[in-house]
Design a protein with these regions (language model features):
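FNR/FR-type flavoprotein reductase catalytic core
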Residues: 73-186
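Ferredoxin-reductase
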Residues: 1-83, 159
Length: 186
């Protein structure tokens, strides 16, 4: 908490984008590098949780993607918040930065957030996105990737088959690729 001092902000939105998945937004008053995180709490006395920024660095709002965890200490309360309610957030931190270089992005579930930020910030040339999810509705923001990335947007779904979707785990899709370097960590 000392590394990430918290300040109050009024939320501007808290929309559900899939079952148990939300995007909380508030006015941006800082600059950040795509891939960074902020700390978030509902009350200053509680330990904050870290969330990757999903908005682009030129967007007027900060977007935080989160998954409702029934029985959790924060997300059940977060999911009930309305525009105008106050949360406590830090400035940006972390060093998982995007790059303009050709890259393979690998994410599952809400782990897509930093790549959404990179994409919306213009770091979207020569990218491949491998996105894992349990259900077809788990590919958050897929509309932003489908047309532009075309064959470089790979969706791996473990529980539901679908057209153009690899039915299985993301890790299995990676193992089946012969053209990926085997000595790298994915």
């Amino acid at each position: 908490p000392e590394k990430f001092p918290l300040k109050p902000v009024k939320i501007t939105g808290n929309r559900q984008i899939a079952p148990d998945v939300y995007v909380l937004s508030y006015q941006r008053d800082f600059t950040f590098v795509p891939g960074q995180v902020v700390a978030l709490a509902i009350d200053q006395s509680e330990n904050p949780r870290m969330y990757s920024i999903a908005s682009g660095m030129h967007d007027e709002e900060i977007w935080l993607l989160y998954n409702l965890k029934p029985g959790g200490s924060l997300t059940p309360r977060l999911s009930k918040l309305k525009p105008g309610d106050v949360v406590y957030v830090s400035g940006p931190g972390g060093n998982f930065y995007g790059t303009a270089k050709p890259s393979v992005w690998i994410a599952s579930g809400t782990g897509i957030a930093p790549f959404v930020s990179m994409w919306r910030s213009g770091l979207n040339k020569d990218k491949m996105l491998i996105h894992g999810g349990r259900f077809l509705h788990s590919f958050y923001f897929e509309d932003q990737f489908t047309d532009k990335l075309a064959g470089n947007y790979i969706r791996c779904c473990t529980r539901e088959p679908g057209e153009g979707i690899y039915h299985g785990r993301l890790t299995q899709w990676l193992k089946e690729r012969e053209n990926l370097p085997k000595n790298r960590k994915y």
